[in-house]
Regions:
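N-terminal intrinsically disordered, cationic/polar leader segments
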Residues: 1-32, 42, 46-116
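Short, conserved glycine- and acidic-residue-centered signature motifs
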Residues: 33, 37
Length: 116
């Protein structure tokens, strides 16, 4: 199962995504659920890299994209850029929610603000 866990710390202007696991919907290379989950993580990583290039982050983001274990964490430089970064994370979170809705046996999402 793919588990996508979103985190935020508004007081520190931080947002994060940790994606772990494999869907197992089909054989490697033919697993549309895994491919969908992966492209969402890669899309977020690219957007966060572009935020860094625009000077919107306080520090370089932590981006690790590995098969079965990806982490994307960043800290915005101010409230305005935090709103932009958070919006990007929320769009990606919506994608994972759609995957979990359509493939609940393969994808789970821990959303921003959701109790553990």
């Amino acid at each position: 199962m793919v588990v996508a866990k979103f985190g935020m710390d508004a007081s520190r202007l931080m947002a994060s995504l940790h994606v772990k696991g494999h869907a197992g919907q089909n054989a490697p290379g033919n697993d549309i659920v895994c491919a969908s989950a992966s492209i969402l993580a890669y899309t977020l990583a690219q957007n966060i890299k572009m935020s860094e290039e625009r000077g919107h982050l306080k520090f370089s983001p932590k981006i690790k994209l590995k098969e079965g274990d990806s982490i994307i964490t960043c800290r915005a430089k101010d409230d305005e850029t935090y709103a932009e970064v958070l919006h990007t994370f929320l769009v990606i979170q919506t994608g994972y929610q759609l995957l979990a809705h359509n493939y609940p046996q393969y994808v789970a999402v821990d959303m921003f603000g959701q109790a553990e």
